[in-house]
Amino acid sequence: MTQFTDIDKLAVSTIRILAVDTVSKANSGHPGAPLGMAPAAHVLWSQMRMNPTNPDWINRDRFVLSNGHAVALLYSMLHLTGYDLSIEDLKQFRQLGSRTPGHPEFELPGVEVTTGPLGQGISNAVGMAMAQANLAATYNKPGFTLSDNYTYVFLGDGCLQEGISSEASSLAGHLKLGNLIAIYDDNKITIDGATSISFDEDVAKRYEAYGWEVLYVENGNEDLAGIAKAIAQAKLSKDKPTLIKMTTTIGYGSLHAGSHSVHGAPLKADDVKQLKSKFGFNPDKSFVVPQEVYDHYQKTILKPGVEANNKWNKLFSEYQKKFPELGAELARRLSGQLPANWESKLPTYTAKDSAVATRKLSETVLEDVYNQLPELIGGSADLTPSNLTRWKEALDFQPPSSGSGNYSGRYIRYGIREHAMGAIMNGISAFGANYKPYGGTFLNFVSYAAGAVRLSALSGHPVIWVATHDSIGVGEDGPTHQPIETLAHFRSLPNIQVWRPADGNEVSAAYKNSLESKHTPSIIALSRQNLPQLEGSSIESASKGGYVLQDVANPDIILVATGSEVSLSVEAAKTLAAKNIKARVVSLPDFFTFDKQPLEYRLSVLPDNVPIMSVEVLATTCWGKYAHQSFGIDRFGASGKAPEVFKFFGFTPEGVAERAQKTIAFYKGDKLISPLKKAF
């Protein structure tokens, strides 16, 4: 067991004062949790295996700050332990353009995931632990332990109150993730006051019921040995994740310690002075780090981390010689590259092929590419038979003791936990090794996971949502299951691909773009009902996000559509042709990708001087960027047989043609410019 001395106490005091100075300089932030959690941070980081000079080393221990408001603690630790974060960076905390934003963001070396919305971090940590278990089961060999890292997470009462933490923690217990250790900052304070006003459940019993090991540290403010003992004991648990319930005092050392007033506001000047005096620091100086503290962390963290990384590099070099195929595969994954020519396995179709639901075409893609992509790992939120997300030879990701799979399996049974699924996918992606996680549910229920989807986009995790039952085509299940506003919501997010493919070639294009994406997540919205294969579609064209599917010379109108309404627009164009009205049909499967194309190309698809009408059985919000007139559904759906529901809302060839004629008449004589053209 580690023996703690005066240098450890000085290091803890330094962390506390540095975090307080960081918040005070910004005159904004959260000093309370860092003051209470500093001892745990010091002890944990002194035991974690990491290399600050190579923060992306694949076998490093991961640290997730789920209570992201305590980020001054994380920034202090990154600075003290040798990461690329200077005192000047700390002084710029929460300032525009700084490297130290108000909550942890994934881009900073040493920050594993973006946190802040409570409950996301613990769920990300579950994903990281799952990824590690899969990597180890896939590549470890006797004498060659390439992957054995732990994932550690700090979380607070707020995280535990969020429903997502229950979803993720329940799954972690089921999966017996012994590589996951969570330290619960039990300070009994929330923003409104004591937790007793709204939160008095027995957290320990709750986590025991989930299948976790639960350990206790009664004095997290000072008991370094007790914290170290709990972490060491947690690492002995190989078939259960561990929750260390650590009692702390929020704002420890402050005049307002133990109260909610110290949670989210800088300490007053007199409080800072007495705090510094109490911990042996000059009350008139700020951002002071004793050299012996730097030296201590250099000795206990930086030097051992570099040595461990070098040792791993030698081991991997030997591994590549003994297991050349696996070694080359892992090296490729660590470089962030997909296998050469993997896309040649994507299925292609002609208009003579039979009509098939795009969810079924998605299943075909997964079936065709899974052997090519060992980094592909996915599942469904208890909708596998509906989402069609499991390839025939898939092995479930399950604890070996379950008898129904093992950790080398790449199909995840998420249960009915959409929000956790989204955050877990973020964690799997953030782990590294080029993991490509996907998760299936109904499109309408991706909304349950909106918080996780937003963080995917903000962080640049290229996760994939396989979102089936994408419209009123759901039919009898009715408006509770029929998405209306869902795509408009997610299309409004920055940095996300939202695909709604119309046929097999477009489904393949959606997967191609999504799997090749480095920093952008994707939602692939798929139909329940059969759709025809289209004349004029191709993977190459659809990969641009939008293209001319069927053209005529000098069109009177352009019909631009997505998904099931593309084939409907083709039929409407025939109806119009019978009336001597010429219509171009444009398919626009993904706005985001189309917007990335050169303006010249986009204007060739949606040009000036022709009225453009969008056709989509969803909310018309967002279509103003591409169409002069929109035909959609801006009310909730209806229960009934799908063809009857389409007819009820006017989505028939005749209904589309009628509205196209009205659009032509409305804009007749006007000098139209493309909606793509804007002043700025």
Swiss-Prot record:
It catalyses: D-sedoheptulose 7-phosphate + D-glyceraldehyde 3-phosphate = aldehydo-D-ribose 5-phosphate + D-xylulose 5-phosphate. This is Transketolase 1. Catalyzes the transfer of a two-carbon ketol group from a ketose donor to an aldose acceptor, via a covalent intermediate with the cofactor thiamine pyrophosphate. Belongs to the transketolase family. Changing H469A: Strongly reduced affinity for xylulose 5-phosphate and ribose 5-phosphate. The record marks H30, H263 as: Important for catalytic activity. One of its GO terms (biological process) is pentose-phosphate shunt. The modification Phosphoserine is found at S286, S335, S402, S492. GO terms for cellular component: cytoplasm; cytosol. Present with 40300 molecules/cell in log phase SD medium. Changing H30 to A/Q: Strongly reduced catalytic activity. Decreases affinity for xylulose 5-phosphate about 15 times. The lineage of its organism: Eukaryota, Fungi, Dikarya, Ascomycota, Saccharomycotina. Coiled coil: none annotated. It holds the Pfam family Transketolase_N. Homodimer. The keyword Ligase does not apply. InterPro entries: THDP-binding (IPR029061), Transketo_C/PFOR_II (IPR009014), Transketolase-like_C_2 (IPR055152), Transketolase-like_Pyr-bd (IPR005475), Transketolase_bac-like (IPR005478), Transketolase_BS (IPR020826), Transketolase_CS (IPR049557), Transketolase_fam (IPR033247). There is a cross-link at K647 (Glycyl lysine isopeptide (Lys-Gly) (interchain with G-Cter in ubiquitin)).
